[in-house]
Amino acid sequence: MGVPPLHPEISAAYSVLETGEPIGREAALMLAALPGEHALDIASLANKVRNRWGKGGVHACSIMNAKSGVCGENCRFCAQSRHNHSDIEVYPLVDEDAVLFEARGCVEQGVSHFGIVTSGYGYLKMSDEFQRILSMIDRLHSELPSLQVCASLGVLGPDTAKALAGRGIAHYNINIQVTPGRYGELIADTHAVEERMETVRLLRRNGVSVCCGGIIGVGEHMEDRVEMMFALRELDVSVIPINVLVPIKGTPLEGAPSLPLDEIVKTFAIMRLVHPRKTIKFAAGRETVMKDFQGLLMLSGADGLLTGGYLTTRGREVADDTRFRAQLASFS
């Protein structure tokens, strides 16, 4: 009995491996529609594309929740929104020493990138609080020169974007979360996704590398995920984090059903085929939702991970992830 051939749509997508050029929207939609039995074939191609055209190795970063809760936006998945009723720790912006302590721990554990994250809509204009964050960044650069400092502070304006660019941050994170056409329905209606997209454009015009992706499992369909992939391609972001929803008690999505595993695998793999040369990062849901299958997703096109914990939920120990990254290297 001969080996069954690849599905024609998957065979056609092998052009990405040869040329490094991404697949188009129609091809991505065709792959997204294939049944689960083809998921591992798509994943295998995505892993080959990552190895040939990606940045090499597995990028790791860690974040600190430097200001927690009492956010006025109504994001349906988020424990930090004051519209929701989650039991989380709430505190104002921490001091520089607290940030330095966390950042030094990252350096000691071999994590190269460290992100300062704050709750809230963002900083359209310069403020005392924003100046404090700039001072934190300056101190990290001064005392930990090997550390790549990142930030995720919400929506920015021209002055605040320019100020961050002047501080030489490695990446700025702001996610579009879902396909822009369904943002108000699936994520939040207290602000528009265009405000986030304009922040990406502002930062890129100022020479800042942008980390921008989304979340899956919030009620979207595979077709919606493909549309998000192409919105990200139009924005030309550098790093693409993919979060798998971790339902949190007290949020509107606390009872959201788990996604079928084959859909998650296809989402990661097709993202790689649409973005063959970008860093694709597995963020939330890696340990808590995917559990035994997290390694499979890291072999489905992803080449980055968030380590050491998330904003309001625990992650895996950095030492465990360091061993995990070393094991993944054998597939490169």
Curated annotation (Swiss-Prot):
GO terms for molecular function: 2 iron, 2 sulfur cluster binding; 4 iron, 4 sulfur cluster binding; biotin synthase activity; iron ion binding. The keyword S-adenosyl-L-methionine applies. Keywords: 2Fe-2S, 4Fe-4S, Biotin biosynthesis, Iron, Iron-sulfur, Metal-binding, S-adenosyl-L-methionine, Transferase. [4Fe-4S] cluster binds at residues 71, 75, 78. It is an enzyme of class 2 (transferase). GO terms for biological process: biotin biosynthetic process. Pathway: Cofactor biosynthesis; biotin biosynthesis; biotin from 7,8-diaminononanoate: step 2/2. Its cofactor is [4Fe-4S] cluster; [2Fe-2S] cluster. Belongs to the radical SAM superfamily. Biotin synthase family. PANTHER family: BIOTIN SYNTHASE (PTHR22976), BIOTIN SYNTHASE, MITOCHONDRIAL (PTHR22976:SF2). NCBIfam families: bioB. Homodimer. This is Biotin synthase. It comes from Chlorobium luteolum (strain DSM 273 / BCRC 81028 / 2530) (Pelodictyon luteolum). The gene is bioB.
